[in-house]
């Protein structure tokens, strides 16, 4: 266990709670000490929803430690069942309360006797998995629970829907632009003549899960959440699934072709080539933009990409393949699925970094000095410190990345959003320069660009004046190169001579 200033993926119980609170009329009870119950506050603050977060903490306190938890946990489950009348109550421990090694399944069985709704224990190992793996497992567990229950009662509908249809699996609360992506995918399906059978878990009712097998296929847009449920449905109900993320023009087309192929295998007769051409050439602006003079200005610019597997891999391919941007480093914090990530981005970047340590990523960014960063909220902080622009492309994210306006990242509208994000993330060099020329006397002073600490070197007046004459968009680089040169040579003060010598040394 380590004390973390920043975590990319939270502890396992956060993943379970994200799934439970995404469903309609499902309540979660968290068996946890005070301090582990921050999920309510986090979700209420970030998700722009009117409803309260349906999560209750059954607090582990000294009385519980003295007498055992059963009485308190069972009472809390039964009380919530009476107050809220949920369809399902999910009980989850946290990594802290798991230390008590209690038989929580026994508590659930005991509570089920008095509760009118269903009660379930989230079957997750809190020491082995993180938030994303736990979310994936919990979703699969809930789907399996209701399909097996329906099968026992003989309530599962037989046969497929009359028209081609799809289940969209993996849309969750606190996901990166999930609501917008969901709307865009529904529009895309409508354009393709595919009905949306169910969307899970966001906004879904557990009572409707028995209808999942009626769809012709499943779509899993995010690799992190939904794959286990899709594999279970394939295994038990022979339902094929598509796990290609429709992000960027090329991958969206590949995803649509795969969906068409699955439909035709089941007796449909669809051809989506004309639709793909129409969208690529005329509807999506991204393909046109990538050939425009604006985008050509970005060709060869250096970028660093970091995020979850889905978004980091997709963004790396879009930058390298569709926009001609040089991705120096692509990275992910999903260490448990590193092989897939390496396979996806190997051809499109120089370096691959698999790490959960934000300091390691920050140091890599400082070393590479890219023109732009595409990452999470943490990389945005790093970019601010280094004065490198950053586009946020993956969770974890803060409030400004839960936009009220429509901003999907998937589908053809998503390609437009990504093109805007990329273009606006690169500093337009002349803008800084012109501000400094015409900005009067209050031009900004030189900023130290170092992740770890401020500069320990002293610049004399002449050198400082000379540095201020350097255009803003390269000044940081000149300052860093000069200081590096001075340290290597053992100078404590930077003079004009040192500046010119450093310039000679780097051949600039």
Swiss-Prot record:
Coiled coil, from the record: none
InterPro entries: ChlB/BchB/BchZ, LI-POR_suB-like_C, Nase/OxRdtase_comp1, P-CP_red_C, Protochl_reductB, Protochlorophyllide_Rdtase
Catalytic site positions: 294 (proton donor)
Sites where the protein binds [4Fe-4S] cluster: 36
Pfam (any one): Oxidored_nitro
Keyword Iron carried by entry: yes
EC number annotated for this UniProt entry: 1.3.7.7
Catalysis: reaction(s): chlorophyllide a + oxidized 2[4Fe-4S]-[ferredoxin] + 2 ADP + 2 phosphate = protochlorophyllide a + reduced 2[4Fe-4S]-[ferredoxin] + 2 ATP + 2 H2O
Keyword Metal-binding: yes
Pathway where this protein functions: Porphyrin-containing compound metabolism; chlorophyll biosynthesis (light-independent)
Gene3D superfamilies: 1.20.89.20, Nitrogenase molybdenum iron protein domain, Proto-chlorophyllide reductase 57 kD subunit B
Chain sites annotated for binding substrate: 429-430
Required cofactor(s): [4Fe-4S] cluster
Taxonomic superkingdom: Bacteria
GO molecular-function terms, A-Z: 4 iron, 4 sulfur cluster binding; ATP binding; metal ion binding; oxidoreductase activity, acting on iron-sulfur proteins as donors; oxidoreductase activity, acting on the CH-CH group of donors, iron-sulfur protein as acceptor
Entry note: cofactor: Binds 1 [4Fe-4S] cluster per heterodimer. The cluster is bound at the heterodimer interface by residues from both subunits.
UniProt keyword list: 4Fe-4S, ATP-binding, Chlorophyll biosynthesis, Iron, Iron-sulfur, Metal-binding, Nucleotide-binding, Oxidoreductase, Photosynthesis
One of the protein's GO biological processes: light-independent chlorophyll biosynthetic process
Functional summary from the UniProt entry: Component of the dark-operative protochlorophyllide reductase (DPOR) that uses Mg-ATP and reduced ferredoxin to reduce ring D of protochlorophyllide (Pchlide) to form chlorophyllide a (Chlide). This reaction is light-independent. The NB-protein (ChlN-ChlB) is the catalytic component of the complex.
Similarity comment: Belongs to the ChlB/BchB/BchZ family.
Subunit record text: Protochlorophyllide reductase is composed of three subunits; ChlL, ChlN and ChlB. Forms a heterotetramer of two ChlB and two ChlN subunits.
PANTHER family: LIGHT-INDEPENDENT PROTOCHLOROPHYLLIDE REDUCTASE SUBUNIT B
Record protein name field: Light-independent protochlorophyllide reductase subunit B
């Amino acid at each position: 266990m380590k004390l973390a200033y920043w975590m990319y993926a939270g502890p396992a119980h956060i993943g379970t709670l994200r799934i439970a609170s995404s469903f309609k009329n499902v309540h979660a009870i968290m068996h946890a000490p005070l301090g582990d119950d921050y999920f309510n506050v986090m979700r209420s603050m970030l998700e722009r929803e009117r409803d309260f977060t349906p999560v209750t903490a059954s607090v582990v306190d000294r009385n519980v430690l003295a007498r055992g938890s059963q009485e308190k946990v069972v009472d809390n489950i039964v009380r919530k069942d009476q107050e809220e009348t949920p369809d399902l109550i999910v009980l989850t421990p946290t990594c802290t309360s798991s230390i008590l090694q209690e038989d929580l399944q026994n508590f659930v069985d005991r509570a089920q006797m008095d509760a009118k709704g269903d009660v379930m224990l989230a079957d997750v190992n809190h020491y082995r998995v993180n938030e994303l793996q736990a979310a994936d497992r919990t979703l699969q567990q809930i789907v399996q629970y209701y399909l097996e229950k329906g099968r026992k009662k003989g309530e599962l509908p037989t046969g497929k829907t009359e028209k081609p249809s799809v289940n969209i699996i993996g849309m969750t609360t606190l996901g990166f632009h999930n609501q917008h992506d969901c709307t865009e995918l529904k529009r895309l399906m409508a354009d393709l003549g595919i009905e949306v059978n169910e969307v899970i878990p966001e906004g879904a009712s557990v009572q409707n899960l028995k209808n999942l097998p009626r769809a012709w296929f499943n779509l899993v847009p995010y690799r992190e959440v939904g794959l286990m449920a899709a594999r279970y449905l394939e295994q038990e109900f022979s339902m094929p699934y598509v796990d290609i993320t429709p992000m960027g023009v090329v991958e969206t087309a590949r995803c649509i072709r795969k969906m068409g192929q699955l439909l035709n295998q089941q007796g449909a007769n669809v051809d989506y080539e004309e639709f793909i051409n129409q969208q690529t050439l005329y509807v999506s602006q991204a393909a046109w933009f990538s050939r425009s003079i604006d985008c050509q200005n970005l060709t060869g610019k250096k970028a660093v990409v970091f995020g979850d597997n889905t978004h980091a891999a997709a963004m790396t391919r879009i930058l390298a393949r569709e926009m001609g941007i040089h991705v120096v480093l692509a990275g992910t914090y999903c260490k448990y699925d590193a092989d897939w990530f390496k396979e996806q981005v190997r051809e499109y970047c120089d370096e691959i970094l698999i790490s959960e340590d934000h300091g390691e990523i920050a140091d890599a960014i400082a070393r590479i000095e890219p023109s732009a960063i595409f990452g999470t909220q943490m990389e945005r902080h790093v970019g601010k410190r280094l004065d490198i622009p950053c586009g946020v492309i993956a969770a974890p994210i803060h409030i400004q990345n839960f936009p009220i306006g429509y901003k999907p990242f998937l589908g053809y509208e998503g390609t437009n959003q990504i093109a805007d994000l990329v273009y606006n993330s690169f500093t337009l060099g002349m803008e800084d320069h012109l501000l400094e020329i015409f900005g009067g006397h209050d031009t900004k002073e030189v900023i130290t660009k170092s992740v770890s600490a401020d500069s320990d070197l002293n610049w004399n007046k002449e050198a400082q004046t000379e540095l201020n004459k350097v255009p803003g968009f390269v000044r940081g680089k000149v300052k860093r190169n000069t200081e590096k040169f001075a340290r290597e040579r053992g100078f404590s003060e930077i003079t004009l001579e040192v500046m010119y010598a450093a310039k000679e040394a780097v051949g600039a």
